[in-house]
Each structure stands twice: as C-alpha cells, then as structure tokens.
UniProtKB/Swiss-Prot annotation:
GO terms, biological process: photosynthesis, light reaction
EC number(s) recorded for this UniProt protein: 7.1.1.-
Similarity comment text for this entry: Belongs to the complex I subunit 3 family.
Protein name according to UniProt: NAD(P)H-quinone oxidoreductase subunit 3, chloroplastic
Function: NDH shuttles electrons from NAD(P)H:plastoquinone, via FMN and iron-sulfur (Fe-S) centers, to quinones in the photosynthetic chain and possibly in a chloroplast respiratory chain. The immediate electron acceptor for the enzyme in this species is believed to be plastoquinone. Couples the redox reaction to proton translocation, and thus conserves the redox energy in a proton gradient.
Cellular component GO terms held in the UniProt record: chloroplast thylakoid membrane
Classification lineage: Eukaryota, Viridiplantae, Streptophyta, Embryophyta, Tracheophyta
Superkingdom of the source species: Eukaryota
Protein localization: Plastid, Chloroplast thylakoid membrane
Reaction(s) catalysed by this chain's protein: a plastoquinone + NADH + (n+1) H(+)(in) = a plastoquinol + NAD(+) + n H(+)(out); a plastoquinone + NADPH + (n+1) H(+)(in) = a plastoquinol + NADP(+) + n H(+)(out)
Membrane topology according to the record: Multi-pass membrane protein
Organism per entry: Cucumis sativus (Cucumber)
Name of the gene encoding the protein in the UniProt record: ndhC
Length: 120
C-alpha cells in the first residue's frame, strides 16, 4: 500500500515553486510601462550607438571548453557525496567510483588527443 500523505510536503513545495514565478511574470506584465519608442527598441552599447551588427558568431572551441567543464563539474557533484561517506560504503563502492573516474579520464584523454582543449 502506498502512503501518499508522506509526499504532501513535496506537492506543497512543487505548487509553491510553480506559482511564484508565474505570479512574478504576471505582476511584471501588469505593472511594466508599455512604451515602444525607437529609443527603447534600439541596441545599447556602452552609451554609444552600436557599430555594425550586434550578433556575433562564437567559435565551436568555446562550446568544447564548456562541454568539458560541465562533464567534470558533474563528476564533482557525484564524487563529493561518495567522498563524504567513504568510510561507511565499503570496497565495492570504492571500485565503482574508480571505474567512474577512469571512464572520465578516458574521455578527457580522448578530448585532449582530438584537440578540443587546444586554445589556438
């Protein structure tokens, strides 16, 4: 038998965290001034008129750096709880964590060999 009343606090949190942003958007839409003057629609660049097109294309190497950063950031999120409870978990979890780290090291070496970490 499932005891759904144990999840009441979760549903309250979910409803409140959904209602607050919706209310914020509605209130800002009602209270914001509606002026569509040319000054409001123009680009603003450090107090002077912009030169050229405002859209700039980024090179793919920046995305590769961001992707490698995200991978190792996620690794930190997974390894921190493991490190905090290392003495309780035992040898099998230690071996699993080593396999996880080895897979990430293989991915880093692959990205390094492919030149994804080269800045020039």
């Amino acid at each position: 038998m499932f005891l759904l009343y144990e999840y009441d606090i979760f549903w309250v949190f979910l409803i409140i965290s959904s209602v607050i942003p919706i209310l914020a958007f509605l209130i800002s839409g009602v209270l914001a001034p509606l002026s569509k003057e040319p000054e409001k629609l123009s680009s603003y660049e450090s107090g002077i008129e912009p030169m050229g097109d405002a859209w700039v294309q980024f090179r793919i190497r920046y995305y590769m750096f961001a992707l490698v950063f995200v991978v190792f950031d996620v690794e930190t999120v997974f390894l921190y709880p493991w490190a905090m409870s290392f003495d309780v978990l035992g040898v099998s979890v230690f071996i699993e964590a080593l396999i996880f780290v080895l897979i990430l090291i293989v991915g880093l070496v692959y990205a390094w060999r492919k030149g994804a970490l080269e800045w020039s």
